Design a protein with these regions (language model features):
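Compositionally biased terminal segments of proteins
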Residues: 1-207
Length: 207
């Protein structure tokens, strides 16, 4: 499953006519068959695990980030008749957002990259491989440590490691090859010691 397709309570309360999940579905369809972009982040996690989670934005890696951003801007604007803008975030990439009176809506982040790491192709979409996705989540978790989004990174790591336990021993080697700092390696060592377990079907009622 790629798109969680979830209605948020705020969308319900505001009687939102254009749901974020609808935009995400269209973006994923736009990505099909392209070789200049790779999906990562939460929607990539959703591609590999059975229990999806909602995310505000779609995260992309591209070898032609600026042109891709312009294409996506035009595509979304024409398809949904909405005001779409691109903002460059220095040293990080490009952000595509919807301009709205009630507050702008963050839709897509695109990071520029020279060459792609290992990928898988699912539903005709290039997606970061499970190992590379786990590694990216470790780096993200450490960089956002203590902030709310770090806990979504940790959740993503847990479900990915449960889905691909055989990759656990390969993560440290991959991190070393990327010359990450000691803080990231220490974070991974702490995560690797965790004994993640699958939840029983009815455990979500235990509160």
């Amino acid at each position: 499953m790629l798109n969680a397709g979830v209605l948020t309570f705020q969308e319900f309360a505001m009687r939102e006519t254009l749901l974020l999940s609808t935009i995400h579905e269209s973006v994923l369809e736009f990505l099909q068959g392209r070789d200049d972009v790779v999906l990562f982040g939460a929607q990539a996690v959703n591609a590999y695990v059975s229990e999806p989670r909602m995310t505000q934005d779609i995260d992309l890696l591209s070898t032609d980030a600026k042109n891709l951003a312009e294409e996506l801007k035009s595509f979304l604007s024409e398809k949904f008749h909405i005001a779409v803008r691109i903002r460059e975030i220095r040293d990080k990439g490009l952000r595509i957002y919807q301009v709205r009176n009630e507050g702008n809506r963050h839709l897509i982040d695109i990071r520029s990259i020279i060459g792609f790491p290992d990928i898988e192709i699912i539903e005709e979409i290039q997606i970061l491989s499970p190992l590379e996705l786990i590694v990216s989540k470790v780096i993200s978790f450490q960089s956002r440590y203590g902030k709310p989004k770090s806990w979504t990174d940790r959740r993503d790591l847990a479900v990915l490691l449960l889905r691909f336990p055989e990759l656990k021993e390969k993560v440290a080697e991959n991190l070393h090859s990327k010359n990450v700092g000691d803080a990231v390696l220490e974070t991974w060592a702490e995560i690797a010691r965790q004994d993640f377990q699958l939840e029983e079907t009815d455990e979500d009622l235990s509160f």
